[in-house]
């Protein structure tokens, strides 16, 4: 059922770095994005795939992880083993404001189905990453999707006192407070 897949698809930030992800798996995930809905069917999002350790390390240096956990980033051995960098081609008419979210969700649901975990990252040093990847100037970086085999537990819980900041307990469990359904529905 889709709800089970959505519950499995959490924002994972720690991975088993000893387990690699083949490029073909990344291509399969991007294919899910390709087959997904797209505003005016423009299919304007482009993708840069990385699954090599050296390039992944360079990408990692351009990312800021977990905004509510100040100064935190994955430790060596717990970093993502693959990245999909989502791009906008500035020379094409675009509907990326919607399409990037649709594509990222499709990629992450596909990853969850394969036993992978991922995290969408918008806190990116785009200028530095653009240079690291040697991208053509026509590409603008939208999002980075980090992927790997999760090595952490993420739990959903009801938000208390309107506090939605995620946090980690002493045992390393990542807690994600969610607003109630009644709070989200306005009528």
Residue map of PLM features:
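Acidic, surface-exposed loops and disordered segments
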Residues: 1-187
